Swiss-Prot record:
<keyword id="KW-0539">Nucleus</keyword>
<keyword id="KW-0804">Transcription</keyword>
<dbReference type="GO" id="GO:0005634">
    <property type="term" value="C:nucleus"/>
</dbReference>
<comment type="similarity">
    <text>Belongs to the LBH family.</text>
</comment>
<keyword id="KW-0963">Cytoplasm</keyword>
<dbReference type="Pfam" id="PF15317">
    <property type="entry name" value="Lbh"/>
</dbReference>
<dbReference type="GO" id="GO:0005737">
    <property type="term" value="C:cytoplasm"/>
</dbReference>
<keyword id="KW-0805">Transcription regulation</keyword>
<comment type="function">
    <text>Transcriptional activator.</text>
</comment>
<dbReference type="InterPro" id="IPR013294">
    <property type="entry name" value="LBH"/>
</dbReference>
<dbReference type="GO" id="GO:0045893">
    <property type="term" value="P:positive regulation of DNA-templated transcription"/>
</dbReference>
<feature type="compositionally biased region" description="Acidic residues">
    <location>
        <begin position="86"/>
        <end position="96"/>
    </location>
</feature>
<dbReference type="InterPro" id="IPR038990">
    <property type="entry name" value="LBH_dom"/>
</dbReference>
<feature type="compositionally biased region" description="Basic and acidic residues">
    <location>
        <begin position="97"/>
        <end position="106"/>
    </location>
</feature>
<feature type="region of interest" description="Disordered">
    <location>
        <begin position="69"/>
        <end position="106"/>
    </location>
</feature>
<feature type="domain" description="LBH">
    <location>
        <begin position="18"/>
        <end position="105"/>
    </location>
</feature>
<protein>
    <recommendedName>
        <fullName>Protein LBH</fullName>
    </recommendedName>
</protein>
Length: 106
């Protein structure tokens, strides 16, 4: 036979019920995080070690590599270094190599 409490229930009965609920639930350590049935798991808070790494990387600009093309230059397009500069540089290298060979022969 159960005794039902009338509407104005004394506080000691409420606290006894709450104590029973608290005692019957598992502790947070026992619950743990396990993967869901569909195999997907999630993390509510980010891993602190990943956050430190992210903070270091977010201040850097991304590196952009532009590969030169081997085609005709469209009108108005600027190239660096200019072709004249490359030709002069190649001629200087050839003259330096010739001078080195002449010095070795002597």
């Amino acid at each position: 036979m159960s005794v039902l409490c009338p509407l104005p229930c004394p506080d000691y009965l409420r606290s006894a019920e709450m104590t029973e609920v608290m005692m019957s639930t598992p502790a947070m350590d026992e619950i743990g995080l396990s993967p869901r049935k569909d195999g997907l798991s999630y993390q509510i808070f980010p891993d602190p070690s990943n956050f430190d790494c992210y903070c270091k990387l977010k201040d850097r600009l991304p590196s952009i590599v532009v590969e030169p093309t081997e085609g005709d230059v469209e009108s108005g397009e600027l190239r660096w270094p200019p072709e004249e500069f490359l030709v002069q540089e190649e001629e200087e290298e050839e003259s330096c190599e010739d001078a080195k060979e002449d010095n070795k022969e002597q």
